[in-house]
Amino acid sequence: MPMPKLLCLHGRRSNAEVTEMQCQGVLELDKVAALHYLDAPFESTAFDKDIGGGRSWVIKDEPPEAKQETLRQSLIHIVRKIASDGPFDGVYGFSQGAAIASLLCEPAVHGALGLTAPPFRFILLVCGADYDKAFGAGVAQEFMGACAAQEDAARQLQEVQHPPAAASRSSLLQLPSLHLMGEKDDILASSQELTQRYAQPQLLFHKSGHAVPAMELCTGEGVQLTNRLRSFIQKPGYA
């Protein structure tokens, strides 16, 4: 039986190489999944001079209107990756990568980008940033509003000839989600806000800050934690 395919998205001012070190060198997720990495489309100053070129999913100092356009370009960048190397069973996101992965799972967003179904079956988020923290206050909300208006216009045209049956729609994301958060993370509150966008989030905590805690994962408690991450990938919703 083939391993599930997992798309891995890095955080702000980071890159795919760092994510590879997190997922393979620390978490060893390559033991249970075929991992695919993607660099964000925009250059930025790296968070550490030793990691090479930094990349980000939005440009920090842009005005909100411009950020919505760069956000759209980043989402299209991910959709193209899905088209070329997917389909993917799940997605891993760290920090800002967790935010943009979550945003793509919003029905209005992936619908406006031409996807007829949710792009992933499950999502694994590490030290995730909620939308306002990741993209700037109100940027994602305005973007989702524009996507919803576009989707509603297309739906209305279709419904003229084919009235739909009544259906309930939840604003919460329905795919299984596992959230690994640092107890000492400066953005812990934002990570907790991100969990509230999901219908049934599963929560895990480590004792470090805004990082994948390499040393902690060498302990007995850390081994148990990584085993739960791997179990979730193999059977989403049952970690």
Predicted regions and their residues:
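Serine-hydrolase catalytic machinery in alpha/beta-hydrolase-like enzymes
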Residues: 3-90, 103
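The conserved beta1-alpha1 loop
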Residues: 7-12, 127, 181-182
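Catalytic histidine-centered segment of alpha/beta-hydrolase-like enzymes
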Residues: 209-221
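Gly/Ala-rich beta-loop-alpha elbow adjacent to hydrolase catalytic centers
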Residues: 92-97, 101
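Active-site nucleophile loop of the alpha/beta-hydrolase fold
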Residues: 40-43, 123-133, 208
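Short beta-strand/loop motif that positions the catalytic acidic residue
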Residues: 172-173, 177-181
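Short alpha-helix in the alpha/beta-hydrolase fold that links the catalytic acid
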Residues: 21-24, 187-197
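Acidic catalytic loop of the alpha/beta-hydrolase fold
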Residues: 131-132, 182-189, 209-211
